[in-house]
Design a protein with these regions (language model features):
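Surface-exposed patches in mature extracellular/periplasmic domains of secreted proteins
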Residues: 79-88, 149-154, 179-180
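Non-catalytic pre-domain segments flanking phosphatase-related domains
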Residues: 2-14, 18-91, 252-265
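Short, acidic loop-to-helix structural element flanking the phosphoryl-transfer center
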Residues: 121-150, 157
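Active-site neighborhood of HAD-like aspartate-dependent phosphohydrolases
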Residues: 81-88, 97-129, 144
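Structural recognition of the beta-strand scaffold that forms the well-ordered cores
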Residues: 88-91, 98-99, 148-153, 201-204, ...
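Sec-exported extracytoplasmic/periplasmic mature domains
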Residues: 76, 80, 103, 140-148, ...
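C-terminal cap/substrate-recognition subdomain and adjoining C-terminal extension
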Residues: 156, 160-265
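Soluble non-cytosolic domains of exported or imported proteins
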Residues: 43, 58-69, 84-85, 125-133, ...
């Protein structure tokens, strides 16, 4: 997850996210949000459909479980085929391995724009994220297969101990200060550091820049072109999780049918 930009969600955006989802997440501080006296009328309610789908829909649960099941099958195959013993998996955390939608829902209900990310520090310290369905089991399997696991996230380094504690509470393996790599160097540089010591056989994320620095700051048209170029990776050594709650696609113009609206009488 990447830290940047404001957020807009629409029902059409949610539908488009069912197969491939990207997201961006900005810098987070720890200030307290002020509640609106009339939250039902505030602009951030436009986030509601995407957030409701991510947190409450059985379809989201199915996609998450499906992704981790297939990733687990591919992981076993890759371990059997690998000649190197220094194998590694790299994963993002937020909305990839752990679910933080309770924070987003709290902010939205208080009419606070969660795209500002100024409430995230409090969540890192005191919040109770849940595991994405299938995630803990997948990483436990990787651990049993002797694969090193690196958690790369743009959570704040100052809250590293709290993030480690949250991951341990959710039964994620190989959680240490060496293997939980938080905000500092760009994600691409953190991945490169791991690649110098291991053969990375799989990556997981909820945004395209979780896989390659080529996607960082790329416009949507460029992202789609890169997805075509990288198609062989998806479902093989790259696995992307759905996240329609925020993303670099938020302000994209929608293509619409130009026929005159007619309703049946």
């Amino acid at each position: 997850m990447k830290r940047s930009t404001s957020i807009a969600c629409t029902s059409i955006a949610v539908v488009s996210m069912l197969s491939v989802a990207g997201c961006a997440a900005p810098d987070r501080a720890g200030t307290r949000a002020e509640e609106s006296p009339n939250p039902e009328n505030c602009a951030v309610q436009e986030h509601a459909m995407g957030l409701r789908w991510q947190q409450q829909s059985a379809e989201a649960q199915a996609l998450q479980s499906q992704t981790y099941r297939i990733a687990g099958e591919r992981l076993e195959e890759k371990v059997k085929q690998a000649k190197s013993k220094d194998l590694a998996v790299i994963t993002d955390l937020d909305e990839t391995a752990i679910d933080n939608t309770k924070l987003l829902a709290r902010d939205m209900t208080a009419c606070h724009d969660y795209s500002v990310w100024d409430t995230w520090g409090q969540w890192e310290l005191k919040g109770s994220p849940s595991a994405i369905p299938g995630a803990a089991e997948f990483f436990q399997k990787a651990d049993e297969l002797g694969v090193s696991i690196y958690y790369i996230s743009d959570r704040t380094e100052e809250n590293l101990d709290a993030t480690i504690a949250s991951l341990k509470d959710l039964d994620f393996p190989q959680v240490s200060k060496d293997q939980v790599m938080l905000l500092g160097l760009p994600k691409e540089e953190r991945r490169t550091k791991i690649q110098k010591e291991h053969k990375v056989i799989m990556q997981l994320g909820d945004t395209l820049h979780d896989f390659s620095g080529d996607y960082a700051n790329a416009h949507l048209d460029q992202q789609r072109q890169l997805v075509e170029k990288d198609a062989k990776h998806f479902g093989d050594d790259w696995f992307i999780l759905p996240n329609p709650t925020y993303g670099s696609w938020e302000d994209a113009e929608l293509d619409k049918w130009d026929a005159k609206l007619e309703t049946k009488k």
